[in-house]
Every structure is written in structure tokens, then in C-alpha cells.
């Protein structure tokens, strides 16, 4: 089986944390024998879906990993951002028939908790690679 090609969409808001997530995700992809072949950085988590859609439209990746960090503020804004981004990301996965995995930490956490959850990126990369392989195996069985 050829190398799994991943796209990665990374939110720049809370960049100190999403930078660590991006690096961990890329390292884990390499460890799994996959390749992060495309990266788009967007201003914030709410902006992730449009970049995911562009990446899926190009068709050069097998899956997309969404990386973001939503930290709790004074209002419920963090919950709205995380819920809407997650929902649209799932919709895009179904629309294009390719895995789009969620490496977005939050909502309802502070900066310390966010730093402790940078491994969400590794989990999202692993889920993307496994899902690509399993869907290809399933397609091959049905032939």
C-alpha cells in the first residue's frame, strides 16, 4: 500500500499551542509511515472548514487533519466555535467521502489544560491514517 497522504489545516489562534500540535502531528504521521503533504494555516478554529473544503476539492490528499485549540473565555463563544467547526468538518468528510479528523482541543478548558492536550493532534493523525487504510481495505474486498 502506498504512503497515506495527509492534509493538515492548522488554526493560528493560540499559536503557541497549535504550533506544538502541528509538530507532534507531523512527527506522528512520519512514525506511522504517512506523509503530511499539504498544510494550510487559518486564523482560527472557526475558519478551518473552508480550508478543509479547498483541500478536499483539490483531491491531492487521502484525508485531512484539523488542528485547533479553543480556550474558554468570559462567554460561551468557545462552545459555539468548537461545535460549529466540528459539525461542518464532519459534514465535509461525508460530502467528499474522505476522512477529516478532529484534532481540536476544547471547549471549556483553560490554557494549562490546552497545553496538556496537545496530543489530540497525534490522535487525529492516527485516526486519519487508520481510517484511510481501513476504507481502502473495505473497497478492495468489495471488488
From Swiss-Prot:
Pathway info: Cofactor biosynthesis; riboflavin biosynthesis; riboflavin from 2-hydroxy-3-oxobutyl phosphate and 5-amino-6-(D-ribitylamino)uracil: step 1/2
Keyword Transferase: yes
Source species, domain of life: Archaea
Organism: Archaeoglobus fulgidus (strain ATCC 49558 / DSM 4304 / JCM 9628 / NBRC 100126 / VC-16)
InterPro entries named among the record's database cross-references: LS (IPR034964), LS/RS (IPR002180), LS/RS_sf (IPR036467)
Catalyzed reactions: (2S)-2-hydroxy-3-oxobutyl phosphate + 5-amino-6-(D-ribitylamino)uracil = 6,7-dimethyl-8-(1-D-ribityl)lumazine + phosphate + 2 H2O + H(+)
Disulfide bonds: none
Annotated NCBIfam families: lumazine-synth
Residues noted as binding (2S)-2-hydroxy-3-oxobutyl phosphate in the record, renumbered to the chain: 74-75, 117
Annotated catalytic residues: 77
Family in the record: Belongs to the DMRL synthase family.
Binding site for 5-amino-6-(D-ribitylamino)uracil: 13, 45-47, 69-71, 102
Entry's Gene Ontology molecular function annotations: 6,7-dimethyl-8-ribityllumazine synthase activity
Protein name: 6,7-dimethyl-8-ribityllumazine synthase
Amino acid at each position: 500500500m502506498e504512503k497515506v497522504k495527509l492534509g493538515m489545516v492548522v488554526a493560528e489562534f493560540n499559536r503557541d499551542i497549535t504550533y506544538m500540535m502541528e509538530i507532534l502531528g507531523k512527527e506522528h504521521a512520519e512514525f506511522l509511515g504517512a506523509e503530511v503533504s499539504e498544510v494550510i494555516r487559518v486564523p482560527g478554529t472557526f475558519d478551518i472548514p473552508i480550508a478543509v473544503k479547498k483541500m478536499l476539492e483539490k483531491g491531492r490528499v487521502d484525508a485531512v487533519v484539523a488542528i485547533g485549540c479553543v480556550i474558554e473565555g468570559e462567554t460561551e463563544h468557545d462552545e459555539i466555535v468548537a461545535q460549529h467547526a466540528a459539525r461542518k468538518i464532519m459534514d465535509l468528510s461525508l460530502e467528499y467521502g474522505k476522512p477529516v479528523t478532529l484534532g481540536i482541543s476544547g471547549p471549556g478548558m483553560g490554557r494549562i489544560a490546552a497545553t496538556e492536550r496537545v496530543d489530540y493532534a497525534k490522535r487525529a493523525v492516527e485516526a486519519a491514517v487508520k481510517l484511510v487504510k481501513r476504507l481502502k481495505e473495505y473497497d478492495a474486498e468489495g471488488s
